[in-house]
From Swiss-Prot:
It comes from the Eukaryota. The modification Phosphoserine is found at S215. Its main location: nucleus. InterPro entries: EAF_fam, Tscrpt_elong_fac_Eaf_N. It is found in: Nucleus. This is Ell-associated factor Eaf. Residues 179-255, 270-564 are annotated as: Disordered. It comes from Drosophila pseudoobscura pseudoobscura. The gene is Eaf. GO terms for cellular component: nucleoplasm; super elongation complex. Belongs to the EAF family. GO terms for biological process: positive regulation of DNA-templated transcription; transcription elongation by RNA polymerase II. Residues 274-283, 315-329, 343-387, 409-420, 463-505, 523-533, 546-564 have a biased composition (Low complexity). Residues 297-309 have a biased composition (Basic residues). The keyword Magnesium does not apply.
């Protein structure tokens, strides 16, 4: 078995004979040389699609950055199109390498010329190491040289030299199997591993600018609203094309329209409930004025919901009689004025005691005057006799307005209690004096008996008439409850209590101000039980219900019969 001897020596590999040859120094050893320079390029991977018959370009940039662009063969591109089904635009015409360069210190290159057999030694200038980039340049054209550069090829196909001593920015190199200084071929397909990462200039991070959708802002209402129907701006409807489309707006009564709603309720439903309060139907000017504060759309919607719930559970509007408005003082007076008014009215029971027969005469006069009874149910008189102290509460906040209404209600209740005490005292004195006079005159004759019988018949007729009036007022209250809502409980409860106190007969007990104040403090969170127990409002306020009043009247009539 014969063993072949490996060619380990340089002479054997170059197929040079044993003869002695002359070794020449190249132009790079000449200090005056400025036209010739030699470089080495080392790359990690060479794809099979590289066209070795075409020229490659080397671009030396700033900071020793080098870019090598190697053209690919058209045949390889067509094969890729057929195999992978790629389009023409996806075919990559170039292979791009990027890396850096460093200078050589004492490295040389030996060049052997096969034709002449001469051997020349040249200095190496730079060592270039590049790597294949992942993204390949498709828009960068290949820079072909204007004229061909003579290249000296070695025995193994190394690049031997160019026409510059310094590394030119664009060195035109003949493509072939490149090797390092040791002459090792680099045509294998093995990828050389390295820890360095090459930053590619062709890779661009496409930053997507996300522009926020500019939804239309909810504009606040103007500071001085126009007396028109106002509606809050509704939220824009969702659209994929971001079209600013708004839903149709619905007129809504806001927090600013409390005074207008109050005026409309006092006018008996004849005023127009809108964004601003208007005058009453009887030609009365607007006492409360238009609203001036503004709120956002969300607060308006929340207030609209609260107002709807409030209107469902609110008691009906209680209209005051005409004569009661004439007897009541202005709500703007202080509590001291109410006490002074009560002190001034104290001599009245004494005058009534000396005239016991005056009260039946007044009751008879009230029975024969239906015009005064009709005035109790007329909303026109209520509109004309409405107090004007609320005209200055236009710009007050809602909490101050409610506290002031509470104070005014307590003052008016105290005044009404004082008047009621005086009337009750006078009635008791009159009844006692009448009973004494009847007992003393029982033996005088048939004239006194006839007068007492007339008085009792008058009392019974008056009781029946008052009961009919109460039933008529209850029916009217139920009718008003269906037609018009009442958002303000305090004022209507005050009017209702005052009307019932004035409609009570002149028989009863002491003051009702403590119990009424306690009931007034708890009336706002419980409007529905108060409305349902309309018939028993006298018992809750410290007075008597209708049944108790009727029983007391019967007892008084029986006592008068016993005295007779």
């Amino acid at each position: 078995m014969m063993m072949t001897k490996q060619k380990n020596t340089l002479a054997e590999r170059l197929n040079i004979g044993d003869e002695v040859r002359e070794l020449k120094l190249g132009s790079t050893f000449n200090p005056k040389n400025t036209s010739t320079a030699f470089h080495t390029i080392k790359y990690d991977f060479k794809p099979a699609s590289v066209d070795t018959s075409r020229m490659a370009t080397v671009d030396v940039g700033s900071n020793n950055q080098v870019t090598v662009i190697v053209p690919n063969s058209e045949l390889a591109l067509n094969v890729r199109l057929l195999i992978f089904g790629l389009t023409e635009s996806s075919g990559v015409p170039h292979t791009v390498y990027k890396g850096n360069q460093r200078e050589y210190a004492k490295e040389c290159l030996m060049i052997y010329d096969k034709e002449t057999g001469a051997i020349t030694i040249e200095k190496l200038n730079h060592n270039i190491q590049v790597k294949k980039t992942r993204t390949e340049v498709t828009n960068k054209p290949v820079q072909l040289p204007a004229q061909s550069v003579p290249m000296n090829m070695g025995h193994q196909g190394q690049v031997l030299g160019t026409n510059g001593s310094v590394p030119p920015p664009m060195a035109q190199l003949a493509q072939g199997p490149l090797s390092g200084p040791g002459g090792k071929l680099e045509n294998s397909t093995m990828r050389v591993s390295s820890k360095t990462k090459v930053s590619t200039g062709s890779r661009r991070n496409n930053i997507i600018d996300f522009k926020p959708r500019n939804s239309p802002m909810q504009q606040s209402s103007p500071s001085r609203p126009v007396v028109t129907h106002r509606s809050p701006q509704s939220a824009p409807a969702w659209d994929a094309n971001n079209a600013q489309q708004t839903l149709p707006s619905i007129p809504m009564i806001t927090d600013d329209d409390d005074f207008g709603l109050r005026a409309a309720l006092h006018n008996g439903g004849q005023a127009n409930i809108s964004g601003s309060s208007t005058g009453s139907s009887s030609g009365q000017p607007d006492l409360y004025g238009s609203s001036s504060s503004s709120h956002m759309g969300k607060q308006r919607q929340a207030h609209g919901k609260r107002q709807q719930i409030h209107q469902r559970s609110s008691p009906p509007v209680q209209q005051q009689p005409h004569y009661q408005q004439q007897q009541q003082p202005n709500y703007g007076r202080a509590y001291n004025g109410a006490s002074n008014y009560a002190q001034q009215q104290q001599p009245q029971p004494q005058q009534q005691r000396h005239s016991p027969h005056q009260q039946p005469h007044q009751q008879q006069h009230q029975r024969h005057s239906p015009q005064q009874q009709q005035q109790r149910h007329s909303p026109q008189q209520l509109q004309q006799q409405r107090p004007t102290s609320y005209g200055h509460s236009n710009n007050m906040p809602m909490d101050l307005d409610s506290s002031r209404e509470h104070d005014l209600a307590s003052q008016s209740v105290a005044q009404a209690a004082a008047v009621l005490e005086q009337q009750i005292g006078g009635a008791l004195s009159a009844s006692s004096s009448s009973s004494e006079s009847d007992s003393s005159d029982s033996d005088s004759g048939s004239d006194s008996d006839d007068s007492t019988e007339d008085d009792r018949s008058m009392k019974e007729q008056q009781e029946q008439q008052q009961q009919q009036q109460l039933q008529h007022q209850q029916l009217q209250l139920q009718h008003q409850q269906i037609q018009q809502p009442a958002p303000h409980h305090q004022r209507h409860q005050q009017q209702q209590s005052q009307q019932h106190m004035n409609q009570l007969p002149n028989l009863g007990l002491g003051s009702i101000s403590p119990s009424y104040n306690n009931h007034h403090n708890h009336q706002q969170p419980q409007p529905q039980p108060q409305q349902q127990q309309m018939s028993g409002v006298y018992a809750s306020n410290g007075g008597f219900p209708n049944d108790l009043l009727q029983n007391d009247l019967q007892l008084s009539s029986n006592s008068s019969d016993d005295d007779d």
